[in-house]
Amino acid sequence: MKIIYDIDCLLYFLKVERTDLLEDEFDRIVISNKVFNSLNNPSIPDFIKEQLNILVDKEFVKVEEISYNTDTFDIYYELINENKDQILGAGEAASIAIAIKNKGIIAYNNPDAIKDYLEKCDLKCITLEDMLNALFKKGTLSKKEFEELFSKSNNY
């Protein structure tokens, strides 16, 4: 099953320099080209861009393009134009579109913000908290590491 990351979850692991935890948990993750471009914005610190590009180069992170005249683009376009009460950013809409097209799981820190889309499209969502709990239960994280990472998550 594909895990499609929105910017917030991935950015956390990049900021705390613990992408090794993602690599322990998943074979590969997917991000949209919109998320990739946002993370390569000049305002993003170089160490984050470098880590991301290393993960892409070693093919742990797959950047999925949202191209015109594709089913994924049609879904994306519908998402950004459909519900004016619940406006999605380009990265969020792209991540949701890829998850819908691939019947994947979306990694997103605020599922309440996209609840309507999750329900309508029958998508599963995992949060940073879900991931940290799973890593702790598996024994990948000690209690001390879990507590440190969890407390840092409130800052992001």
Regions found by a protein language model. Give the residues of each.
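Active-site-proximal, substrate-binding regions of enzyme catalytic domains
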Residues: 2-98, 102-104, 115, 147-150
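Short beta-strand scaffold positions
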Residues: 108-109
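Acidic, PIN/NYN-like endoribonuclease modules and their adjacent C-terminal/linker elements
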Residues: 112-156
